[in-house]
Design a protein with these regions (language model features):
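N-terminal glycine-rich phosphate/pyrophosphate-binding loops that anchor nucleotide-derived ligands
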Residues: 2-97, 140
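Glycine-rich anion-binding loops of enzyme active sites
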Residues: 62-76, 85, 101-160
Length: 160
């Protein structure tokens, strides 16, 4: 199968956020974790698990907070470069939504390597890299797994 004939969206059971676990089910899964604090925390948790927001925010000193998020999803378009750009912009936008500025991101990639050419994965990552570059955000590695369904996104750390 040539890369030009592959429709990435055919490999996803739902596009993008349509693959999310429904809110009520997710709340049930998270119920035992909410409110479970840490002893001797490294900073003051301003936005956390019990807030259900776009990202976590931890104040580390007066006037300085760390914003952290992770976001990934299945293909929403067929072009791998565009999908990478969309997924990266979506991940970075979570930091912006919390009033922060993205500083560093790492890739999160699930790829069916026996089904889809790795050249397509490289295009997805290139799209993500280009969005990070335009945003002034470092891209510093990431994590990948062999997965029957393609998934891509980023974990992003910012400051506010």
């Amino acid at each position: 199968v040539t890369a030009t004939k592959i429709r990435l969206t055919q490999f996803a059971h739902g596009g993008g956020c349509a693959c999310k676990i429904p809110p009520g089910e997710l709340e049930a899964v998270l119920a035992g974790l909410i409110g479970a604090g840490v002893t001797d925390p490294a900073g003051e948790l301003i936005v956390g698990l019990d807030d259900g927001d776009d990202a976590a925010v931890v104040r580390i000193e007066h006037g300085v907070a760390v914003v952290a998020t992770a976001d990934f999803f299945t293909p929403v378009v067929d072009d791998p470069y565009d999908w990478g750009r969309i997924a990266a912009a979506n991940a970075l936008s979570d930091v912006y939504a919390m009033g922060g500025r993205p500083v560093v991101a790492v890739n999160l990639l699930g790829w069916p390597r026996d089904v889809l050419p790795l050249e397509l994965a490289a295009e997805v990552l290139r799209g993500g890299r280009d969005v990070c570059g335009s945003a002034g955000c470092h891209l510093a590695g990431g994590h990948s797994v062999d997965d029957p369904e393609p998934k891509y996104g980023m974990a992003v750390t910012g400051i506010a």
